[in-house]
Amino acid sequence: MASPRHPVSAHAVALVQMDRLQTFAFSVCWSDNSDTFVRRSWDEFRQLQKTLKKTFPVEAGLLRRSEQVLPKLPDAPLLTRRGHTGRGLVRLRLLDTYVQALLATSEHILRSSALHGFFVPKPLDLEPMLPPGSLVILPTPEEPLSQPRGSLDIHSLEAQSIPCVQPFHTLDIRDRPFHTKAQEILDILLRHPSGWWLVENKDQQVAWFPAPYLEEVATCQGQESGLALQGSGRQFCTTQAYEGSRSDELSVPSGARVHVLETSDRGWWLCRYNGRTGLLPAMSLQPEGLGSLLGRPGFPDSAGADKVAEDRTIPPVVPTRPCMSAIQSRCCSITRRALGQEQGTRVPR
């Protein structure tokens, strides 16, 4: 059965990890020009593939292989480097390729109820906050084989002391436990564009540390959110579909992302959606959770510096660690010796 609204494009944006459970976040654009964020597990993607093969046996190549148009769903190797998280990031790239190939197939597959039901936001996708302990890991783009001579991706600076926003646990460059507390002061030794900075604590332990957990980065991100908010309105998502009955009302599907321009205690808020401005019932709106994290890495949208302390209750986004070869290739020999890399130390995994 064909659905009136169908997905037209989608791309992977993040790996969301909680303990051993991994979900893959996608930004989905629909035929009515709306866009949503959804999270799906690897098993859910496998089940989608089985459903599509059963629903479209010809397109799956079950009758004639030459007629196959449905893409295959490959898996990441079991022995992927960097363990569970590394395998999740490999799967994220594979799923991105798979979904884009899937949405490039024939029109009747795009309009199928199976595909619509998979990508339509579920109640879990509409929650204003992620489960406690969740880590949102953003993939880094694939590095080119060669870069222009003289380009530096790691920037050194004099040691600067910055407090931590929240507690964080990792390993130092010698694989020893490295634990920090909220407001603990760390000395910044090197900054890397991947979001992992080289820091030193009061015990002279050196470790790679996620920059969003540091006060300077978090404050800057909060200020940027406030500036953007003044011009475009705070972003919310709809918890249910609404069909406008008057000319000054908007019609929106469930899970749509809207900008709230003006709130009111009368129960109707002025919003902008899909290029139109109109009223929506406040009871059908809630602050975006995943979308805010992915739209502004580190913290959700904020109305100003007064909300920074409140926003810190949400764990910052942890960027993907840079690989060992990327760091070594951009460090001079003096830096390598300082890090002890020539004695066999490495970036913790």
Curated annotation (Swiss-Prot):
Explain the purpose of this protein.
Constitutively potentiates the superoxide-generating activity of NOX1 and NOX3 and is required for the biogenesis of otoconia/otolith, which are crystalline structures of the inner ear involved in the perception of gravity. Isoform 3 is more potent than isoform 1 in activating NOX3. Together with NOXA1, may also substitute to NCF1/p47phox and NCF2/p67phox in supporting the phagocyte NOX2/gp91phox superoxide-generating activity.
Q: Where is this region: Proline-rich region?
A: 315-324
> What's the short name of a Pfam family annotated to this entry?
SH3_1
Subcellular location, in the record's words?
Cell membrane
Disulfide linkage: none
Domain SH3, residue spans: 160-219, 231-290
GO-annotated cellular components: NADPH oxidase complex; plasma membrane
Q: A biological process (GO) annotation for this entry?
A: extracellular matrix disassembly
User: Which PANTHER family does this chain map to?
Assistant: NADPH OXIDASE ORGANIZER 1, SH3 MULTIPLE DOMAIN
Superkingdom field: Eukaryota
Biological source species: Mus musculus (Mouse)
> How does the record classify its membrane topology?
Peripheral membrane protein
What name is this protein filed under? NADPH oxidase organizer 1
Kindly give the SUPFAM superfamilies that the UniProt entry links to this protein: PX domain (SSF64268), SH3-domain (SSF50044)
Q: Name one GO molecular function term.
A: superoxide-generating NADPH oxidase activator activity
Q: Which SMART domains match?
A: SH3 (SM00326)
Question: Mainly resides where?
Answer: membrane
Boundaries of every PX domain copy: 1-126
Q: In which tissues is it expressed?
A: Strongly expressed by colon epithelial cells and to a lower extent in small intestine, uterus, stomach and testis. Expressed in different parts of the inner ear including sensory and nonsensory cell layers of the saccule, ampullae of the semicircular canals, the stria vascularis and the spiral glanglion neurons.
